Curated annotation (Swiss-Prot):
Protein name per the record: Alkaline nuclease
Family (UniProt): Belongs to the herpesviridae alkaline nuclease family.
Site (Required for function): 197, 257, 282, 284
Gene3D superfamilies referenced in this protein's UniProt entry, alphabetically: 3.90.320.10
Subunit structure: Interacts with major DNA-binding protein; this interaction increases the nuclease processivity of the alkaline exonuclease.
Pfam families referenced in this protein's UniProt entry, alphabetically: Viral_alk_exo
Cross-referenced InterPro entries: Herpes_alk_exo, PDDEXK-like_dom_sf, Restrct_endonuc-II-like, Viral_alk_exo
Any one GO molecular-function label of the UniProt entry: endonuclease activity
Free-text function comment from the UniProt entry: Plays a role in processing non linear or branched viral DNA intermediates in order to promote the production of mature packaged unit-length linear progeny viral DNA molecules. Exhibits endonuclease and exonuclease activities and accepts both double-stranded and single-stranded DNA as substrate. Exonuclease digestion of DNA is in the 5'-> 3' direction and the products are 5'-monophosphate nucleosides. Additionally, forms a recombinase with the major DNA-binding protein, which displays strand exchange activity.
Subcellular location, record wording: Host nucleus; Host cytoplasm
Keyword field contains Ion transport: no
Amino acid sequence: MELGTKFPLSKSCKDESRKRKRGITIDCDSQILVGDEQSNSTKTKPYDEICENIVPNYTFGNYILQKIDPNDCRHSLHPLYHRLFYIADVIKQGISEGSLLENKYSYILETEHILLDESRINNLSPSIHASRWCKMVESLTRLQANSELWHIFRQCLLTASSVKWSPNGTINTAGLITNDLPSRGQTESILFGTRNESLAKSLIAALCVSQSSVRTIDNSDKKNEFDNTTTGILDIEKYSCGLMIDIRTGMLGASLDMVMCNRNRHGILAPCLTDNNIETYEIKCRFKYAFCPEMRSELSQCYERLMATKTVQWFRRFLYTIDCPCVDYFRPDNYPRAKEALITSDDDWKVGHSAYHAAQSRIKCNEFEMHHLTLNKNMSSRVWLFGEPDLQTNSIYPLLWNTGERVLSIPIFANPRHQNFKQIFLQSYVASGYFGNRKIVPFLATFIGRHRRQTELGRCFSLFVDDTEASEVVYEITPEQAIPVILIITPVIIDNTFYVGIEESGYRAFGELVDHLWAKQCRI
């Protein structure tokens, strides 16, 4: 694919660009880091404080205007190389300013000359070395929102969490230049998710992840430092994932919540030779169910009945107690609304507001949504229920359902019309470039927790996977975290034949970005 066709510029703009090629300054949205993003202080740094440390300086927009000649776009580098060279510039600038420690980033800069040599002879598709760079960038940004580099590298990217989808099922690439920094302050729902994501991760790691899925590197005798076969409290950070930049186009990005994959001694993703599948998890902590059990409400009463009976009937009643439940019912002869991430057409779930809306509406779906609805409609979700804290031992255990089973299977599946599904789809597309022929197996995790009683405030609780004497603590629930109530794990089936459209959107976005920047520069 030649890039020259993607940068149509007017003659006046081209002429003006020659005059302005040197000494360019623009007011494009920008971020640059101050402070060592790998330091221990960064890990505990407040979210808003990250924003204070990022100041305007050198952006991807600056890079494009300085390095891409609009008159010679046909011979321009592949967009991914431009993205990686910009990242190298940021790291070098951070080192020169003293905001980054050179010894922590030397291993990536030492191979920049190889990347440059390969880019000169390969403008159609990225090289294996470029792929390695992307993996190194991912390893540098695993702190995500607590990483300055993560904020910087996300700029001018179509990210899985923020991309807009057109009604026809394609990505809307308009308005790519936006300020990706988080807004000052956070809503209560965002804070709830931020505080409890690590708790949800520990539940997933303890209850869903097979111990056999994490082995030593290439089955060698040398133990992987990210191995999960040790006992005791789980190290959930080994499943964390940094910014994955689309290896195909360099214009899309995704930061997954959990990736079940080994890493080498440098922290680079390194799946075992026998790993055919790579599991990923997108976690949603549903604040709308965060009730206070000491305040009498319909939700708290349903919770009490659920704790007493442990039946699917009262689980369903609990979910449907609120006005906008997290599971939406639709008629089998119709399509679901885009309102909720989880849906069902099972008649047992035809209750409450969902049943009313299902009877009132006729829904239109695009090809992407209809196809993935067919793929997912026969899938089931797994549900775990957690008991009340034991205040004498400060312990919490999963409960057995009335069937005697620890896991309940319910006819609930992922909604292809919802933004969460499309976010996971784009994540899977980006992640697929990092694991060769291995299949990406995504899941949507729904965590429901409640507020604490007065007697539970200020306490740390030990989380166990069961109530047997042999059970070990897998996580320490901190005083600011919620009391876990329910964990729902929903498989998401993806058809990768739709990846072609995503790739085309990435290339189109790069062309539109260059056009926009140079057109804006011509008007200055």
